[in-house]
């Protein structure tokens, strides 16, 4: 039977999109990131730029993307504005050189911002799917993200049907687009595996310009084996959580976990799964990543809610080959639900995220090196940290051979402040900050988390700062960062083996 939607090439699809358009793309991490059309847009940008014609787009996604989108389009100088999150080296350089305007924002806010026009008109949506039906049901692939909202609010839609993605992924999907306030009812999610929606998103068929066929898997790199620092951080986190269970502050059946991405997060999850005293647990998180696959198959992870399956090829193959097992244990949701403050608070989620640096009072910088240069973005860390039952931040105490301390007197940029950060962990130890005033917090962080080579400096800073509820010396609070910029080391005379 003939499809009601025309088959078009990626190049044809790209030709429909004019300079200056606002284009939304599927993807939450590399999972379900649009693949063919972004590459064609990059090629079109190079061609037009070669003729002296302008071609730049405003790009909005659910989170970061794979290299086919942000990296490829940035190399082609095809992006003028970007939100809400990125992890592309080339795009990062363009943002930090003010070539690209970047809106770093909480991920659960994206759908509502689209609905109410905070970003202006959405001209196009390019969405990966396994199927679109004649009546406009769109079956998404390895992430849900903000795609359901993009489909509803874009003026025109292009669907990438990816034949490499399993049609059975729809069995994990639970899609609901919230109505606008003040007409929202309580969201009846009382367990990480509760389903309240449908396995498909919806689009007006009249908006669909065509289908681009692809056959390309997600490009998710595998994580490196955890190093000694990551393992020591993981040990401290596991020991703390077990002590909380013993003290009756975490129930014996445990609480749902949220974990950020990266090697430290993977090390923590692996350590939790391996420890015989940790009961089998659930997750309510943004991303389902590699470390969780074996934990689930071993019966250590009972169920997981996420916005995406951000899995390396080998782990994705394992999931798809065992869909009868995994389909009932993983729920994929839109990011306004996976990161919803009310659900996080109701379930009592334990949030575990990584920091670039933390100051002696527990303020966390997650995004900007020396307060100036963006790395990736705040992502969902703020939503989980502010609303979790326990908020934990992790980072190494030093890096670059000791030239950088990740515990500093004052963070030059703050994403998650002292009011939300309860636990701080480095390989040196764990600082429980609950119930402590600023002076006590500072003493504990320096004592438990700072590297020995920096402890004397931090203690001296604290003792010499003028008195106040929060002691700071505004003439010296960024001395370590200035030293780093001017001398390449926070303590230029420090020599570490």
Where are these regions (language model features)?
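Conserved alpha/beta enzyme-core scaffold
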Residues: 1-497
């Amino acid at each position: 039977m003939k499809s009601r939607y025309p088959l078009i090439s990626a190049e044809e699809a790209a030709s429909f999109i004019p300079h200056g358009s606002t284009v939304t793309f599927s993807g939450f991490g590399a999972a379900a990131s649009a693949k063919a059309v972004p590459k064609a847009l990059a090629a079109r940008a190079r061609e037009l730029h070669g003729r002296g014609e302008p071609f730049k787009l405003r790009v909005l996604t659910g989170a970061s993307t794979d290299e086919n989108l942000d990296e490829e389009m940035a190399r082609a100088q095809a992006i003028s504005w970007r939100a809400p999150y990125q992890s592309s080296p080339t795009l990062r350089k363009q943002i930090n050189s003010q070539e690209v305007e970047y809106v770093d924002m909480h991920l659960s806010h994206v759908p509502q911002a689209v609905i109410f026009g905070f970003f202006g008109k959405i001209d196009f949506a390019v969405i990966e799917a396994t199927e679109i039906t004649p009546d406009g049901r769109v079956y998404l692939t390895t992430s849900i993200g903000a795609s359901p909202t993009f489909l509803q609010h874009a003026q025109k839609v292009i669907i990438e049907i990816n034949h490499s993605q399993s049609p059975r992924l729809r069995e994990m999907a639970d899609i609901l687009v919230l109505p606008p306030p003040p007409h929202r009812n309580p969201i009846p999610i009382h367990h990480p595996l509760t389903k309240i929606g449908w396995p498909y998103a919806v689009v007006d068929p009249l908006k669909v310009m065509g289908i681009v066929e692809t056959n390309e898997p997600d490009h998710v790199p595998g994580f490196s084996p955890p190093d000694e620092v990551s393992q020591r951080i993981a040990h401290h986190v596991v020991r703390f959580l077990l002590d909380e269970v013993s003290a009756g502050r975490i129930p014996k059946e445990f609480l749902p976990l949220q974990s950020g991405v990266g090697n430290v997060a993977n090390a923590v999850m692996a350590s939790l799964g391996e420890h015989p005293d940790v009961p089998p647990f659930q997750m309510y998180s943004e991303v389902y990543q590699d470390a969780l696959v074996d934990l689930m198959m071993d019966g250590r992870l009972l169920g997981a809610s996420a916005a995406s399956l951000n899995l390396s090829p080998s782990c994705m193959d394992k999931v798809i080959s065992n869909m009868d097992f995994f389909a009932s244990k993983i729920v994929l949701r839109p990011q306004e639900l996976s990161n919803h403050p009310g659900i996080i608070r109701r379930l009592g989620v334990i949030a575990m995220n990584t920091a670039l640096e933390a100051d002696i009072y527990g303020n966390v910088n997650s995004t900007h090196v020396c307060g100036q240069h963006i790395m990736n973005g705040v992502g969902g860390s703020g939503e989980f940290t502010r609303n979790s039952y326990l908020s934990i931040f992790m980072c190494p105490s030093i890096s670059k051979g000791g030239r950088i301390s990740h515990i500093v007197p004052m963070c030059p940029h703050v994403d998650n402040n002292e009011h939300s950060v309860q636990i701080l962990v480095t390989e040196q130890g764990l600082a429980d900050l609950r119930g402590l005033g600023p002076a006590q917090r500072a003493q504990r962080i320096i004592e438990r988390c700072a590297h020995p080579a920096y402890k004397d400096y931090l203690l001296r800073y604290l003792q010499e700062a003028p008195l106040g509820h929060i002691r700071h010396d505004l003439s010296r609070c960024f001395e370590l960062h200035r030293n780093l910029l001017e001398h390449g080391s926070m303590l230029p005379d420090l020599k570490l083996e």
